Amino acid sequence: PNYQFGNKATAYTATEIENYRKLLDDKSSNVFNDDQSLGGYGMGAKIRFPGEDNLNKGSYQDFGDIWLDFSAMGITDDNVQNYRRELNLQTGIASTEFSYKNVSYKREHFVSSPDQVMVTNLSASEKGKLNFSAKMELNNDNLEGKLTFDVRNQTCTIEGKVKDNDLKFRTTMKLLLTGGEITADEKNQVYRIKNADQVTIIMAAETDYKNDYPTYRDKEKNLSNVIDTRINDSSKKSYDELKQTHIEDHQSLFDRVSLDLGEFQTSVPTD
């Protein structure tokens, strides 16, 4: 909140920085004083920082919350078994597994840099066992926006701006089903999935930010076109294709270095 974008037009010059470095190297007692030898800008009261003349540097903001409700299946924290969560550093995929009424359930999550989308996949060991509701909410007082449903395309979109600096944003969630059926409760702004074999949730998000002083805005960017293109292109791929593309991209960097600490136990819990 209260983000003031931009760089100070008059910040440290290369000469000033070099002068400070020399004084630090020489252990000068004047480094932290208002030393006139530095043009009146010692590293004391008159130090000049980049950014605007205030202490508020802004903070990261969330685009919204995605809620998945499995109460229709009777699942609670107390009646599931074999619960396990994992973050696989080698694949860059987070997963959750558990069993309920002799059925094994699995959820996988990753963010794909090549496709510029976040992907969640829900599956079960038996067909027709996925029953839940999904919704997206704008739950951030620093943002203002509106939520729209596109029932035909099974999407939910939030579009708006940051209140303090008018930074525009747009995010879309799309549901892809294998088996089962999906209905839209537009009044409560929620999708209900019934008897599905597998569900893939694709989410894309974007802002009109541009690293270009002094406005830091891309007025030419059409957020609707950018998001729709990402969602449509990703939706044409199977979950396995999206997953494999992500893993290959992740491992192209991750596999450059390996560290062997000897024997280790994979069954030791982190809690």
Residue ranges and their predicted role:
Residues 1-271:
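Aromatic-residue-lined binding/catalytic grooves and analogous aromatic/hydrophobic interfacial grooves
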